[in-house]
Amino acid sequence: MIRKTPNLQNDIINIQERYSNNLVMDVGGGRNSRKNVNFRRPPPAMTSENSKHELRRTFSSQKRLMIPANYFSLESLVILVGLTASLLILPLVLPPLPPPPFMLLLVPIGIMVLLIILAFMPSSSSRAKDVTRTFM
């Protein structure tokens, strides 16, 4: 059994039609006292200019629904791909390097210790102390 799937454009149009048809709400307390209240505006008289504007608005709203947001620009994507390729290829091409001197290894450790000390050090500004009291 082969089932055909409808295309995405028809699904979007069907969802929009269902949404616009379901704007009628039931209002009332009991089963017999329900009233149909329509919150839709009456359609304005259609002129050729209005219909063109409506058609443009429909197409632009469909484009916004269908196109996902781009998180990376083209330049940042090229940089990301280039950096990834270099990190994969350079270790295979370069010869193994000797370890750095011991004193050079202490530099990042010293920077980390300095940042930890500065993070827990109280500030000397009385204004900053007032700000921290309001949050505690």
From Swiss-Prot:
Name the keywords, alphabetized. Cytoplasm, Developmental protein, Endoplasmic reticulum, Membrane, Nucleus, Transmembrane, Transmembrane helix
Question: From the record, what ranges are coiled-coil?
Answer: none
The record's subcellular locations are: Membrane; Nucleus; Cytoplasm; Endoplasmic reticulum
Q: Region (Organ Size Related (OSR) domain): which ranges? A: 72-123
GO biological process: one example: positive regulation of cell population proliferation
Q: In which tissues is it expressed?
A: Mostly expressed in cotyledons and young siliques and, at low levels, in roots, rosette leaves, leaves, inflorescence stems and flowers.
This protein's membrane topology, according to the annotation, is:
Multi-pass membrane protein
The induction field says: By auxin (e.g. NAA).
Instruction: Tell me the InterPro entries matching this sequence.
Output: ARGOS/ARL/OSR1 (IPR037468)
Gene Ontology cellular-component terms for this entry are: endoplasmic reticulum; membrane; nucleus
Ranges that cross the membrane: 77-97, 101-121
Q: What does this protein do?
A: Promotes cell proliferation-dependent organ growth.
Q: Which family does it belong to?
A: Belongs to the plant organ size related (OSR) protein family.
What's in the domain note? Answer: The OSR domain is sufficient to promote organ growth.
> By what name is this protein known?
Protein AUXIN-REGULATED GENE INVOLVED IN ORGAN SIZE
